[in-house]
Each structure stands twice: as structure tokens, then as C-alpha cells.
Amino acid sequence: MSSKKSAPGSANIAQNRQATHEYFIEERLEAGLVLEGWEVKSLRAGKAQLKESFVMLKNGEAWLFGAHFSPLPSASTHVQPDPTRSRKLLLHAEELSRLIGQVERKGYTLVPLSLYWKQGRAKLEIGLARGKKQHDKRAAEKERDWEREKQRVMRRG
């Protein structure tokens, strides 16, 4: 349940809801995607999944791996779609150099958080994240349960 389909016409395409459970998100960035035509059509239909995807820095460039864009049956016949191909992310040079430094030296990781439309272009929100330990996950769950219980009591009382 880590990717969520959006209603047709809304800006949100897919979310990686599992990322906030697995990581502390320190910083959020917006990146463009290099896509093929059939991928854009799939995104417009809401056929994207970020569940097991990750961002990797290679040769001074950011790449999205493991994201699944399901091809539409009406896609072009002369194109062989690869649903899980690696996709290049478009970031400014300063952002890339800063991210490379933080990922390599400080032990952070880059996690895709959500995929959405902005002014007719597909954008990916990536998070600079630090992994949670098991006790951190338990504490976060306990905090979430307490907030929910507090809201329940406030509504009744």
C-alpha cells in the first residue's frame, strides 16, 4: 500500500507512503524526469508505482531505479516499453554536488517520495533521508497512536 493512485485530473500521480515509515526525511527536493512518450501517457492514466524505487547518484547524475510505469495497451506498437527502466532525474548542478557530498560523506540516502504534475510536466519529489532503526519506528507508531487517541477524546469530550 505504498503507492496511491490519484483521481483523474489531480496533480498527484503516485506516493511512496512507506518512505516516511522507513526513513527520517531531512530535506525535500523537486526533480524533473526524462521520460519517453509512452511513459507520459501511463502517468496521465495514473499507472505508476514508487513502492520499491530508489534514487542513485552515478557519474555526477541522479537516476531513478525500480519505479514501475505500466505501459498502456494502446501504446505504440513499434516501441518496446520497459516498465522498470532507469530514468534520469533533472537537477541543478549545485543541488547535485550538494547531494553527492551529503550522500557520500554523511551517510544519507535519496528516496523518491511522490510523483506529480506541475505546469504540465512530471516532477518527482525526492527526500534526503536517514534510515530509521526498529526502536525509532516503534516510537513513531506509538506517537501516531497517541495523537489519534487524543483526537478521539477531544471529539467526544
Curated annotation (Swiss-Prot):
GO MF entry, a single one: RNA binding
Keyword Cytoplasm among record annotations: yes
CDD domains: SmpB
Key words, A-Z: Cytoplasm, RNA-binding
Presence of keyword RNA-binding: yes
Residue span of region Disordered: 128-157
PROSITE patterns in UniProt: SSRP (PS01317)
GO cellular component: cytosol
Gene3D superfamilies recorded: 2.40.280.10
Superkingdom of this protein's organism: Bacteria
Predominant location category: cytoplasm
GO biological process: trans-translation
Regions that span the bilayer: none
Pfam family, one: SmpB
Compartments (UniProt record): Cytoplasm
Basic and acidic residues bias (residue ranges): 137-157
HAMAP family referenced in this protein's UniProt entry, alphabetically: SmpB (MF_00023)
Similarity section: Belongs to the SmpB family.
Function: Required for rescue of stalled ribosomes mediated by trans-translation. Binds to transfer-messenger RNA (tmRNA), required for stable association of tmRNA with ribosomes. tmRNA and SmpB together mimic tRNA shape, replacing the anticodon stem-loop with SmpB. tmRNA is encoded by the ssrA gene; the 2 termini fold to resemble tRNA(Ala) and it encodes a 'tag peptide', a short internal open reading frame. During trans-translation Ala-aminoacylated tmRNA acts like a tRNA, entering the A-site of stalled ribosomes, displacing the stalled mRNA.
Protein name in UniProt: SsrA-binding protein
